[in-house]
């Protein structure tokens, strides 16, 4: 089955992501995304979790707190969600929405290398705090 190609279903592609995390017996799973909205004024960071372990919410809070405190964009908070990859994987997992591609200000931010590096560093700091 071509799980990453044009013939793969959404479920096959999502399950392939879960399989990678499970294959390597990961301690946690972080799925990174860029959000979009028909409302061009909506923006901000959000982190989603599914409460299948005692640590999903804590991981989400640690990452979201780092992101929210360091950028001039809206903090959309930590939210519970039923997303496939964070629900189906066995370890603590989060899905991070890093701003909105549909918001011109945030699109400009996301194109900057400094933003990409800082976002990666802040997510890593949230993960470090989770393990502390």
Regions found by a protein language model. Name each.
Residues 1-58:
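Catalytic-core regions of hydrolytic enzymes
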């Amino acid at each position: 089955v071509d799980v990453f190609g044009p013939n793969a279903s959404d479920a096959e592609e999502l399950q392939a992501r879960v399989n990678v995390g499970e294959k390597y017996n990961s301690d946690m799973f972080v799925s990174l995304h860029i959000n979009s909205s028909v409302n061009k004024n909506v923006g901000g960071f959000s982190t989603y979790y599914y409460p299948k372990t005692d640590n999903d919410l804590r991981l989400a809070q640690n990452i979201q707190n780092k992101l929210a405190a360091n950028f001039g964009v809206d903090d959309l908070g930590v939210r519970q969600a039923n997303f496939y990859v964070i629900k189906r994987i066995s370890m603590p997992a989060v899905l991070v929405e890093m701003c909105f591609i549909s918001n011109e200000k945030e699109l400009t931010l996301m194109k900057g290398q400094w933003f990409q590096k800082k976002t990666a560093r802040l997510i890593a700091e949230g993960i470090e705090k989770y393990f502390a």
